[in-house]
């Protein structure tokens, strides 16, 4: 595909190149990623329905988990439809549409960064201060944290989008990614994007490194607390759960940090797309499995839901 400049004319749309350099795999990719998208929606919807329908799951840990699942559904849905379109035909998106996609995806991803930190802190309180936990994480506290994470995401990315919206784009209009990636998007501006870039860098450092540091600190203290428990099945289960949670969290935060805090670390655009898949597709796919893997309460609620559905089908 030839990339051409449009000169000094203001462009009205962008072309998302996606995986344009391997057209022979487009149909296979379409099938695979459609299946993955369906699994993401179903897996996360089951978690939400289980938490809403089961009185036993009306606890902070599960309220946070349901919100995480909702975030995963929304921000994956902000990206994947255009990616799937690119496997079948040339995917175009208007400048306004690109701004909207970046705002929705960025806001939800920022909210997820903050929510993951809240979830780690919640587990720290539950494990290290079990007697005081009901007071430390009461209904007003955990609902306030949920609302704060959502609002913070939209406020932070709303500021960035307001700055980007002032830029002028006059070509080229090709984005070598499967979604409107911020760095590539503002890199195409023919007006000075430095204010938007510096602002994004500062906000990214704040919204990524601080929550990630809180997560690492929380899990470190959890590990110390677990080490005091006599060796046995419960201790092994706790370590297994912590390690699986950290694996998902590290993948999510690590790829975002590479993109928005140290973008020069990615020298290959193909590698950039692979990293993008990790936090746009892989993490939302595995979050429901990882966070409910050893949870009997969630398993019981899910079995109840599936049995009800099966009974209704038979009737």
From Swiss-Prot:
<feature type="disulfide bond">
    <location>
        <begin position="98"/>
        <end position="190"/>
    </location>
</feature>
<keyword id="KW-0675">Receptor</keyword>
<feature type="topological domain" description="Cytoplasmic">
    <location>
        <begin position="294"/>
        <end position="315"/>
    </location>
</feature>
<feature type="topological domain" description="Extracellular">
    <location>
        <begin position="260"/>
        <end position="272"/>
    </location>
</feature>
<feature type="glycosylation site" description="N-linked (GlcNAc...) asparagine">
    <location>
        <position position="8"/>
    </location>
</feature>
<feature type="topological domain" description="Cytoplasmic">
    <location>
        <begin position="219"/>
        <end position="238"/>
    </location>
</feature>
<keyword id="KW-1003">Cell membrane</keyword>
<keyword id="KW-0807">Transducer</keyword>
<feature type="transmembrane region" description="Helical; Name=7">
    <location>
        <begin position="273"/>
        <end position="293"/>
    </location>
</feature>
<keyword id="KW-1015">Disulfide bond</keyword>
<feature type="transmembrane region" description="Helical; Name=4">
    <location>
        <begin position="141"/>
        <end position="161"/>
    </location>
</feature>
<keyword id="KW-0716">Sensory transduction</keyword>
<feature type="topological domain" description="Extracellular">
    <location>
        <begin position="162"/>
        <end position="198"/>
    </location>
</feature>
<dbReference type="GO" id="GO:0004984">
    <property type="term" value="F:olfactory receptor activity"/>
</dbReference>
<dbReference type="GO" id="GO:0005886">
    <property type="term" value="C:plasma membrane"/>
</dbReference>
<feature type="transmembrane region" description="Helical; Name=6">
    <location>
        <begin position="239"/>
        <end position="259"/>
    </location>
</feature>
<dbReference type="InterPro" id="IPR017452">
    <property type="entry name" value="GPCR_Rhodpsn_7TM"/>
</dbReference>
<feature type="topological domain" description="Cytoplasmic">
    <location>
        <begin position="49"/>
        <end position="56"/>
    </location>
</feature>
<feature type="transmembrane region" description="Helical; Name=2">
    <location>
        <begin position="57"/>
        <end position="77"/>
    </location>
</feature>
<keyword id="KW-1133">Transmembrane helix</keyword>
<keyword id="KW-0812">Transmembrane</keyword>
<comment type="similarity">
    <text>Belongs to the G-protein coupled receptor 1 family.</text>
</comment>
<feature type="topological domain" description="Extracellular">
    <location>
        <begin position="78"/>
        <end position="100"/>
    </location>
</feature>
<feature type="topological domain" description="Cytoplasmic">
    <location>
        <begin position="122"/>
        <end position="140"/>
    </location>
</feature>
<feature type="topological domain" description="Extracellular">
    <location>
        <begin position="1"/>
        <end position="27"/>
    </location>
</feature>
<dbReference type="GO" id="GO:0004930">
    <property type="term" value="F:G protein-coupled receptor activity"/>
</dbReference>
<dbReference type="InterPro" id="IPR000725">
    <property type="entry name" value="Olfact_rcpt"/>
</dbReference>
<keyword id="KW-0297">G-protein coupled receptor</keyword>
<feature type="transmembrane region" description="Helical; Name=1">
    <location>
        <begin position="28"/>
        <end position="48"/>
    </location>
</feature>
<feature type="transmembrane region" description="Helical; Name=3">
    <location>
        <begin position="101"/>
        <end position="121"/>
    </location>
</feature>
<keyword id="KW-0472">Membrane</keyword>
<keyword id="KW-0325">Glycoprotein</keyword>
<dbReference type="InterPro" id="IPR000276">
    <property type="entry name" value="GPCR_Rhodpsn"/>
</dbReference>
<dbReference type="Pfam" id="PF13853">
    <property type="entry name" value="7tm_4"/>
</dbReference>
<feature type="transmembrane region" description="Helical; Name=5">
    <location>
        <begin position="199"/>
        <end position="218"/>
    </location>
</feature>
<dbReference type="InterPro" id="IPR050939">
    <property type="entry name" value="Olfactory_GPCR1"/>
</dbReference>
<protein>
    <recommendedName>
        <fullName>Olfactory receptor 11A1</fullName>
    </recommendedName>
</protein>
<comment type="function">
    <text>Odorant receptor.</text>
</comment>
<keyword id="KW-0552">Olfaction</keyword>
């Amino acid at each position: 595909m030839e990339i051409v400049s449009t000169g000094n004319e203001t462009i009205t749309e962008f072309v998302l190149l996606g995986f344009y350099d391997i057209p022979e795999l487009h149909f296979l990719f379409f099938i695979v990623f459609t299946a993955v998208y369906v699994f993401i929606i179903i897996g996360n919807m089951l978690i939400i329905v289980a938490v809403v329908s089961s009185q036993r799951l009306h606890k902070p840990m599960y309220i946070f988990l349901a919100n995480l699942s909702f975030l995963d559904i929304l921000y994956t849905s902000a990206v994947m439809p255009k990616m799937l379109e690119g496997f079948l035909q040339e995917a175009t998106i208007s400048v306004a549409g690109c701004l909207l996609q970046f705002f929705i995806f960025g806001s939800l991803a920022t909210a997820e960064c903050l929510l993951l930190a809240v979830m780690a802190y919640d587990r720290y309180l539950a494990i290290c201060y079990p007697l005081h936990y009901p007071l430390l994480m009461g209904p007003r506290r955990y609902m306030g944290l949920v609302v704060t994470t959502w609002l913070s995401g939209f406020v932070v990315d709303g500021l960035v989008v307001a700055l980007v919206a002032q830029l002028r784009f006059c070509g080229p209009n090709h984005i070598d990614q499967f979604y409107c990636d911020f760095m590539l998007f503002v890199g195409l501006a023919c007006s000075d994007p430095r204010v938007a870039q510096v602002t994004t860098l500062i906000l990214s450092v704040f919204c990524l490194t601080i929550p990630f540091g809180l997560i690492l600190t929380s899990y470190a203290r959890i590990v110390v607390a677990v080490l005091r428990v006599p060796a046995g099945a419960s201790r092994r289960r706790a370590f297994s759960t912590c390690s699986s949670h950290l694996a998902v969290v590290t993948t999510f935060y690590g790829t975002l940090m590479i993109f928005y805090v140290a973008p020069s670390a990615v020298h290959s655009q193909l590698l950039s797309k692979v990293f993008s898949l990790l936090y746009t597709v892989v993490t939302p796919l595995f979050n429901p499995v990882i966070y409910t893997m050893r949870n009997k309460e969630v398993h019981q609620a899910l079995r109840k839901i599936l049995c009800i559905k099966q009974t209704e089908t038979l009737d």
